[in-house]
Regions:
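Short loop->beta transition adjacent to catalytic acidic/histidine clusters or analogous donor-positioning motifs
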Residues: 2-4, 27-36
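Short beta-strand-to-loop acidic/aromatic patch adjacent to the donor-nucleotide binding site
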Residues: 112-123
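Active-site-proximal specificity loops/subdomain of glycosyltransferases
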Residues: 38-110
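Short beta-alpha junction loops
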Residues: 38-44, 121-122, 147-149
Length: 149
């Protein structure tokens, strides 16, 4: 069985849909992986037809409580890191985790042994890293990327 690439997305604009479409086309041309798109917005037919699985979940719960807001960081001009709850009005972590759980549950139920989870706004020019990660998953349970400061 092929590895599965799960793409989580929330494409509420044409521009975001086009970014997702570009990623799906890159994966479709590679043809070495099965592809699932999980989204809280409807998935256009032309995108869905190029996937192995498409999962639309209308429940897109956002957290608005002050104590549940995320603290995104940004570093303008690489001069000073700023971390604040006041950069947005809500936290989307619950919605994101819901897509991860739904995608992984479907993958497990269908018998996939290896899953690669990426966001819709990735641009994959070279799949070497995914092939390398697939080999690593023969030995390890998980491969995680972290930001080193």
């Amino acid at each position: 069985m092929k590895d599965l690439i799960i793409v989580s997305s929330y494409c509420d604009t044409k521009q975001k849909e086009d970014i997702l479409r570009n990623l799906v086309n890159q994966c479709y041309k590679e043809n070495s992986f099965d592809l699932m798109v999980v989204s809280h917005t409807t998935i256009p037919d032309d995108i869905s037809k190029k996937t192995t699985l498409s999962l639309y979940d209308s429940k897109n719960e956002l957290l608005y409580d002050w104590d549940l807001r995320s603290k995104p960081w940004f570093n303008p001009g690489n001069e000073r890191e700023i971390q604040s709850i006041f950069t947005g009005f809500f936290n989307s972590h619950l919605a994101i985790w819901r897509m991860i759980i739904l995608g992984n549950s479907v993958a497990k139920n269908l018998g996939y042994k290896k899953v690669h989870h990426i966001e819709y706004d990735c641009d994959i020019k070279d799949f070497t890293e995914i092939y390398d990660n697939s080999k690593l998953l023969d030995t390890y349970d998980c491969i995680n990327y972290t930001k080193i400061i």
